[in-house]
Amino acid sequence: RLGGARSAALQLDWGQALGCAGFFTIALPEGDSREPSSLLRTGGRLLRFWLAATRLGLAVQPGLAMLMFAHYGAAGVRFTDDPRLLRDAARCHGRLRALVGDDAPRLVFVGRIGE
């Protein structure tokens, strides 16, 4: 029997992920900074994408925890006193970077899409 966070992860993350049509990322255009105006433009693009998907009968599910913990790992943010979780965040950063390469620092959204 699984309990606590493992059970929640299986139900909320893995189960949903296996049933979705695909995953996607949205990144700031090359050369754009993380200034508010750039982030707002990118947010507008994300909103248009999300609304278009909804019109097509598709659902979009954000997956922002991965981005948050990858950022914590990259920046060395001490979000907890638990050394295991700090190592996990650093590993999360490494895995994200392995998946998307040099685009990792520009990512602003990760999601899944499906019916």
Label each PLM-derived region with a short phrase:
Residues 1-115:
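Acidic, surface-exposed loops and disordered segments
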